[in-house]
Amino acid sequence: MSSAAEYQLNPYLGWQKEQGIPIHTGFFVEDLRKVRLGFWKGRNANGAFINLSNAVVNDAVVLEVPPGEKTVPRRQLFDESVMVVEGQGATSMWYEDGRKKTFEWQQGSVFAIPPNVWHEHYAMSAPARLVSCTSAPLYMQLFNNNDFIFNCDYKFLDRYAEEENYFVESPQLLRGFKGIETNFIADVRQWFTRENVYALEEKGGFRQSRDRAST
């Protein structure tokens, strides 16, 4: 539990409190589908923060978009990775003077939001619940200037250059490392099946790290 003094000294905790939505603390969350939410006016959605114990660099945010609604467009300097807990919908992303690119997602989808890119989420006929992991705590404590964090127009073209296939599932194998690199996974529950792991091993993806660990 964060004290009143911590909220005054920590820019991120102070910003959290200003959003007016529940802040859950502790060592774990048993079921993200059942986390209590509150209306987040700044996002036009229901939301909650999750402050896991001793997590000072990253945070977790639960966002539930009502059926047929969309979130308020936002951009931010920090990184954000999103997983769809429930529902179906779509996300649009664009630079200030660029063209919108929209991709669809479903339960189990995982995608990354590049820094300083405008984005908004849409829900289809049922509520869509998303959980995000961001580096907002680090950035807010580092800069202590939310206008800069949420209104910087610098384009990180090395991260996102408006490529047509940016949000297409096309994982790149990280050789010698137990993992993949991708901007979008249609359903993470299906991706890491035994068959896919074996396929990666045949390409030299996982076996190398296993061998190294066993020596």
Where are the model-predicted features located?
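His/acidic/aromatic-lined binding-pocket segments of jelly-roll/cupin-type domains
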Residues: 62-63, 72-75, 79-84, 102-103, ...
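Short histidine-centered beta-strand/loop micro-motifs
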Residues: 49-53, 70-76, 93, 102-103, ...
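A short, N-terminal "cap"/entry segment at the start of jelly-roll beta-barrel domains
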Residues: 1-57, 155-215
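Glycine- and acidic-residue-biased ligand/ion/polar-headgroup-sensing regions
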Residues: 66-67, 76-96, 215
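Short acidic-glycine-tyrosine-enriched beta hairpin
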Residues: 54-56, 95-116
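Histidine-centered metal-chelating micro-motifs
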Residues: 69-72, 90-91, 109-121, 127
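A short hydrophobic beta-strand segment most commonly corresponding to one strand
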Residues: 81-83, 112, 125-146
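A structural feature that tracks compact, well-ordered secondary-structure segments
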Residues: 60-64, 94, 122
